[in-house]
Amino acid sequence: MSGHSKWATTKHKKAVIDAKRGKLFAKMIKNIEVAARTGGADPAGNPTLFDAIQKAKKSSVPNKNIDSAVKRGAGLEAGGADYETIMYEGYGPNGVAVLIECLTDNRNRAASDVRVAMTRNGGNMADPGSVSYLFNRKGVVIVPKGELSEDDVLGAVLDAGAEEVNDLGESFEVVSEATDLVAVRTALQDAGIDYDSADANFVPTMQVELDEEGARKIFKLIDALEDSDDVQNVFANFDVSDEVMEKVDA
């Protein structure tokens, strides 16, 4: 989920230990399989596969599951599905724009899951293009803070194409053009700086500020969407203050 970055970071930590762990693993495995199918089984020559594997490893997905996914995707092992990426657009409560990225082998099932989740949680589906223009495709790398300063991170990635470094509290968010994502990730590695994830995300050009009630409603909608096996990512243009987040987390 991407919208409020601090929420996304908190949610990621919880996801590793909560009841959705198996579902999270399955989605990561699906990403690996598709990356291997489209770009080959060698992570060294397939940056998308490399990042998908790294993300899975950091979430403690077993190595044997990762290896099998790579082999299935590359056609070296039977059992791979024919997945396609589908984007759905809509509006959530309080006019929050929502992009839903699905990776599915059943278009009808995915469409039904998304529509049901939206309509049951105060959302509405929208026509293609009516929401996506509010987002730009960007490279986003999350770096655990540790002993690092913002200047440490900025110095490592500035010449690689990074546009900004944002302090998220316990981590830094490095934003770049999607085409510079690999260069930014490589620059961090060369500088000896570890990172939690490197993804091409849809970043909103403007955000809707939400109060506690609004935050709870949009989080409920996003949880319902992410509960579908076909939904890989949900992007939304909302923001909430630290004070509101503390109330929601309580």
Swiss-Prot record:
Locations listed in the record: Cytoplasm
One Pfam family here: TACO1_YebC_N
Keyword terms, alphabetized: Cytoplasm, DNA-binding, Transcription, Transcription regulation
Signal peptide per UniProt: none
GO cellular component: cytosol
Listed GO biological process terms: regulation of DNA-templated transcription
Example of a GO MF term: DNA binding
Location (main, coarse): cytoplasm
Taxonomic superkingdom: Bacteria
Family named by the database record: Belongs to the TACO1 family.
Descriptive protein name: Probable transcriptional regulatory protein SAV_6832
